Regions:
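Conserved small/polar residues in nucleotide/adenosyl-binding loops
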Residues: 145-147
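Short, structured patches in soluble enzyme cores that scaffold and shape functional sites
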Residues: 138-140
Length: 147
């Protein structure tokens, strides 16, 4: 028996769950990355209700403001056209090497300031795209203490 998702099921998917390029500690990426709007369109075809994403799922870590704006606008347009809700936005303060000691817990004041600015920018992004939830996941915060 196959069950098709319905909008009232409110299935949402993180773009990182489908956009992951297959890299791991033992090897480099094994499949190409698609643009986030391509994932959004496909998820809508499969019956998704909404999407969630990290800031850097939409634009590269080192993107300039023009590139960020273009990519956010394109994703928002794709989500709206497909009838998808952008349910949650979060920020990535753990992947880039600058955050090796955490975005908010680094001993380096400059890294903490940068991490906080990145988080606040992502809060604004969440509000802009209509997300009802913002998550600050501290993936590397105090990570050595937890080993």
């Amino acid at each position: 028996m196959t069950r098709e998702p319905r909008p009232e099921d409110r299935f949402s998917f993180g773009l990182w769950t489908v956009g992951w390029p297959g890299a791991d500690p033992f090897g480099t990426a094994s499949r190409p990355m698609l643009d986030p709007w391509q994932y959004a369109e496909k998820l809508a075809e499969l019956g998704a209700w909404g999407i969630t994403f990290h800031d850097n799922d939409v634009f590269p870590f080192d993107a300039d403001e023009t590139t960020k704006r273009q990519r956010v606008d394109r994703l928002k347009q794709a989500a709206d056209s497909a009838g998808l809700v952008i349910e949650m936005v979060t920020t990535n303060t753990f992947t880039h090497p600058v955050f090796k000691d955490g975005g908010l817990t680094s001993n380096d004041r400059g890294v903490r300031r940068f991490g906080l600015r990145k988080i606040l920018d992502a809060v604004d992004l969440a509000a802009e795209v209509g997300a009802s939830t913002f998550v600050m996941w501290g993936g590397r915060e105090l990570s050595l203490i937890h080993i």
